[in-house]
């Protein structure tokens, strides 16, 4: 399996970051972890040090897109890595999930592949919901304490499907959009960079950056984001979005896009 750079974006909420790190301790994949912190005011940086993870910090808040582009720069500049994952801090990654994503890349000619999550966790892209493809996973799939059990069940179903010569039913499939809480890319993604350092356009400071990249770069080149139907990542949906708007005072008061987003939700 190729080597993975896992870039986790953070802004406060260190309790969720800690839970994410605990899930990483159980993995046996070949990954390096870098945390890109956007000016947290809690103990997030200290938590990163406690777990031994590199943490890139800011002197002022720059927004999520800036963090994503920083992750891309690390990936592009180091030939050691075959894959880049950009992920929120409010996730739990079960053992086996990353390996399934890599297998999808090895089998299919996609530049970006994403896992399934819960219906709530995938937000605006319900196509990624595990409940579309597996019966009997709910309600336990919505409980974080069962996140590893869900991945294990998926792999059991995969093996049963293989034995019945119906593995095609779980083939990776392309989608019209993806949710930005967790997405994995290979080196082909470099073809879509905006300039030598940025993969994502910088006019979207915090939200809609994945949609813009999807429509402008992926779909327009017939390189759709793809869903791996044998990989599951639990996402605490809502923790890393609107809660941040309420606390990200400097950006929300000075950047027009943030003001617009706050107005849309009555903030």
Where on the chain are the PLM-derived regions?
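Active-site donor/metal-binding and catalytic loop motifs
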Residues: 227-246
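Short, acidic, metal-binding catalytic loop of nucleotide-sugar glycosyltransferases
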Residues: 22-31
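A conserved acidic beta->alpha catalytic loop
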Residues: 37-45
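A short, conserved alpha-helix in the catalytic core of glycosyltransferases
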Residues: 176-183, 188-193, 203-231
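Glycine-rich, basic loop-to-helix element that forms the pyrophosphate-binding segment
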Residues: 59-75
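A recurrent flexible, glycine/aromatic-enriched loop bordering the glycosyltransferase active site
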Residues: 149-156, 162-185
């Amino acid at each position: 399996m190729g080597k993975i750079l896992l870039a986790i974006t953070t802004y406060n909420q260190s309790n969720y970051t800690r839970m994410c790190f605990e899930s990483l301790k159980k993995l046996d994949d070949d990954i390096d972890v870098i945390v890109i912190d956007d000016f947290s005011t809690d103990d997030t940086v200290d938590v990163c040090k406690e777990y031994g993870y590199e943490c890139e910090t800011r002197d002022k808040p720059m927004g999520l897109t800036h963090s994503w582009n920083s992750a891309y720069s690390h990936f592009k500049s180091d030939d050691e890595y075959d894959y880049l994952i950009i992920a929120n801090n409010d996730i739990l990654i079960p053992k086996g999930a990353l390996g399934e994503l890599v297998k999808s890349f090895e089998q299919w000619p996609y530049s970006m592949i994403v896992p399934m999550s819960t219906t709530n966790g995938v937000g605006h892209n319900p196509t990624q919901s595990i409940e579309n493809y597996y019966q009997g996973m709910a309600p336990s799939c919505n409980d974080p304490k069962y996140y590893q059990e869900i991945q294990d069940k998926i792999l059991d179903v995969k093996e049963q499907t293989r034995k019945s010569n119906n593995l095609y039913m779980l083939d990776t499939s392309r989608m019209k959009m993806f949710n930005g809480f967790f997405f994995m890319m290979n080196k082909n993604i470099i073809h879509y960079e905006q300039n030598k350092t940025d993969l994502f356009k910088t006019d979207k400071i915090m939200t809609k950056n994945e949609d813009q990249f999807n429509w402008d770069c992926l779909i327009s080149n017939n390189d759709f984001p793809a869903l791996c139907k044998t990989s599951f990542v639990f996402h605490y949906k809502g923790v890393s979005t609107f809660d941040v708007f309420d606390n990200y005072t400097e950006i929300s008061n000075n950047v027009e896009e943030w003001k617009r987003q706050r107005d849309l939700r009555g903030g």
